[in-house]
Amino acid sequence: MDIALAIKALILGIVEGLTEFLPISSTGHLILAGQLLDFNDEKGKIFEIVIQFGAILAVCWEFRHKIIDVIKGLPNDPRQQRFALNVIVATIPAITLALIFGKAIKAHLFNPIVVASAFIIGGLVILWAEWRERHRGQTHDPRGNALLEAAKAGAPRVETLDDLRLSDAFKVGLAQCFALIPGTSRSGSTIIGGLLFGLSRKVATEFSFFLAIPVIFGATVYELYKERALLSTDDLSIFGIGFVAAFISAFFCVRWLLRFIASHDFRGFAWYRIVFGVIVLVTAYTHLIAWQA
């Protein structure tokens, strides 16, 4: 086994696992890391598909009890049927656009400059969304400028996954479409979209996790079938290293994020995106790093 290649696979697997479910864009990080590590050829693209599969399996394991309950309840449990329908409805917009524009997006937008720009814009959107969340529960006293807390106005409308309506799911699905632009972040689009549409932070995050399952599973199966001619048993060890690294790092990342959102917002991720995006743009325009267009 090529040790240098194995180390690259390990690093990229960890990058995928740590960034797939945070609002910072795994695709954007993989594009940048792949170029820095010189691991962005055709085999590298197949490798990215494999490690995404490892990351999504970590979510399936973390939420295995809920997934089993949904499967068991599909024949006769209206609550589980409604949840499954919500996931399906939220998945349709992004899949539809990906099938129509996927090739054009990969041909023209999968480059560091677009990624960096999306990092910055996405960070600004997160800051605005968090500002909106903090001020949603405040209103002005008509007799003066004093602010009064309006608990009812500030409380999220959707506090549990069972409260999620079909229209809510569809709106989150529309928000997910922005994630087709590399650097935007699928989890960031769905979580922030959920917050803007009245979901609590916990519900928006959990629904984003569940929404990732059909999206990433579907993309993995489709891409592996399409690129099956490039698959080789010689690559199994390298793919295996990346797969396991992505699974383990994603598993711990998902658990950490679920604890984190209980007492924190996403402003830290927003500033990270902005700073990282600026660094990429500066290094590109000053030629400190020869990013490929």
UniProtKB/Swiss-Prot annotation:
Disulfide bonds: none
Compartments, as annotated in UniProt: Cell inner membrane
Pfam families: BacA
GO MF terms, alphabetically ordered: undecaprenyl-diphosphatase activity
Protein's organism: Ralstonia nicotianae (strain ATCC BAA-1114 / GMI1000) (Ralstonia solanacearum)
EC number assigned by the record: 3.6.1.27
HAMAP family: Undec_diphosphatase
Entry superkingdom: Bacteria
GO process annotations (BP): cell wall organization; peptidoglycan biosynthetic process; regulation of cell shape; response to antibiotic
Entry's Gene Ontology cellular component terms: plasma membrane
Main location: membrane
Protein's name according to its UniProt entry: Undecaprenyl-diphosphatase
Further comment found in the protein's record: Bacitracin is thought to be involved in the inhibition of peptidoglycan synthesis by sequestering undecaprenyl diphosphate, thereby reducing the pool of lipid carrier available.
Family per similarity comment: Belongs to the UppP family.
InterPro entries in the record: UppP
Membrane topology of this protein: Multi-pass membrane protein
Biological classification of the source: Bacteria, Pseudomonadati, Pseudomonadota, Betaproteobacteria, Burkholderiales
Catalysis: reaction(s): di-trans,octa-cis-undecaprenyl diphosphate + H2O = di-trans,octa-cis-undecaprenyl phosphate + phosphate + H(+)
The protein's enzyme class: hydrolase
Role noted for this protein: Catalyzes the dephosphorylation of undecaprenyl diphosphate (UPP). Confers resistance to bacitracin.
Membrane-spanning parts: 3-23, 43-63, 85-105, 109-129, 203-223, 238-258, 269-289
Record key words, sorted: Antibiotic resistance, Cell inner membrane, Cell membrane, Cell shape, Cell wall biogenesis/degradation, Hydrolase, Membrane, Peptidoglycan synthesis, Transmembrane, Transmembrane helix
Keyword Nuclease: no
Encoding gene (name): uppP
